[in-house]
C-alpha cells in the first residue's frame, strides 16, 4: 500500500490490514469494531478500493472482494446465496431466475424434485484467494454463536481471509 492514507488516524489499522491481506492462509479473522455511524463500512470500502483497484482485465489475479451485509440474515443458506451472487452476478438477473424456475417446473413435471437442493450444492463458495467481508454482524438475526461458527468455517477449514465488521456494544 502507498504511504498516502485516506485515514491518517487509522494508519495502524491500514498497516495491519496490509499485513493480513498479504498472508496466504491466516487461520484467523479480523474484527473491525466501533460504534454505529463512525464509518467502519466506509473505511473498509475505501481501503479495499485503494489496495485492489477495479480490475480491467478478468485474467488479472486481483483477489475478489466479497462484501456481505448480515443485516436481517436468518440462515447460513441466505449468506451462501449472497456469496454465490457476488461470484456469479448473472444469478441476480431476472432472466436467470426465470430460467431457473422454468427449468425447475419442467423437472418437477417429470417427477424430479429440486426443492431439497441448495444453491451451494452447485457452486463453490470458498475461494482462498478472495477476501470476505461480513458487515453488520450485530444486525444478523442468527444467534451470534451460529453466525460466528459459520464464518469460522471460511477461515479454519477453507483458508479464506475474513474481515468482520460490527459493533461489539450492540
Segments the model singles out, each with a brief description of its role:
Residues 7-27:
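Pre-Walker A adenine-sensing motif
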Residues 24, 117-130:
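Short basic/glycine-enriched coil/helix segment immediately N-terminal to the Walker B
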Residues 26-45:
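Walker A/P-loop nucleotide-binding motif
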Residues 40-62:
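P-loop NTPase Walker A phosphate-binding motif
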Residues 66-75:
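A short hydrophobic beta-strand->loop->alpha-helix junction that borders the nucleotide-binding pocket
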Residues 74-97, 104:
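Conserved NTP-binding/hydrolysis module of P-loop NTPases
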Residues 92-121:
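Glycine- and small hydrophobic-rich membrane-insertion segments that are intrinsically disordered
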Residues 125-169:
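Conserved Walker B catalytic segment
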